[in-house]
Amino acid sequence: MAATQSEIRYLTPPSVDVKKKKYCRFKKNGIKYIDYKDPEFLKKFLNEQGKILPRRITGTSLKFQRRVAQAVKRARHLALLPYVTDLMK
């Protein structure tokens, strides 16, 4: 009985996911200013409901995440981006 418990058999072998290293696209491309008047660019940082995606998903640095959040909020205030939506993308 002890021998059967130590042998664990899987129907499919367990896969080890190789995660890509996240990088800040602003630092990599040398972007200094995030334009709040460009809603197509800002949509990359929003989910389907219109919420701002967190840093752990987008990979942006803290400095540029703050700038993205400020730009999205300005665009929402000017009605360039919606505050809430069902399906954005």
Swiss-Prot record:
GO cellular component, one term: cytosolic small ribosomal subunit
Record's signal peptide: none
Matches recorded under InterPro entries: Ribosomal_bS18, Ribosomal_bS18_CS, Ribosomal_bS18_sf
The UniProt record lists the keyword RNA-binding: yes
Gene Ontology BP annotations: translation
Highest rank taxon of the organism: Bacteria
Keyword Acetylation: no
Any single Pfam family the record assigns to this protein: Ribosomal_S18
Coiled-coil intervals, chain numbering: none
GO molecular function: small ribosomal subunit rRNA binding; structural constituent of ribosome
Keywords, ordered alphabetically: Ribonucleoprotein, Ribosomal protein, RNA-binding, rRNA-binding
UniProt cross-references to PROSITE patterns, sorted A to Z: RIBOSOMAL_S18 (PS00057)
Role, per record: Binds as a heterodimer with protein bS6 to the central domain of the 16S rRNA, where it helps stabilize the platform of the 30S subunit.
Protein family membership: Belongs to the bacterial ribosomal protein bS18 family.
Self-association and partners: Part of the 30S ribosomal subunit. Forms a tight heterodimer with protein bS6.
HAMAP family per UniProt: Ribosomal_bS18
Name of this chain's protein: Small ribosomal subunit protein bS18
Protein source organism: Parabacteroides distasonis (strain ATCC 8503 / DSM 20701 / CIP 104284 / JCM 5825 / NCTC 11152)
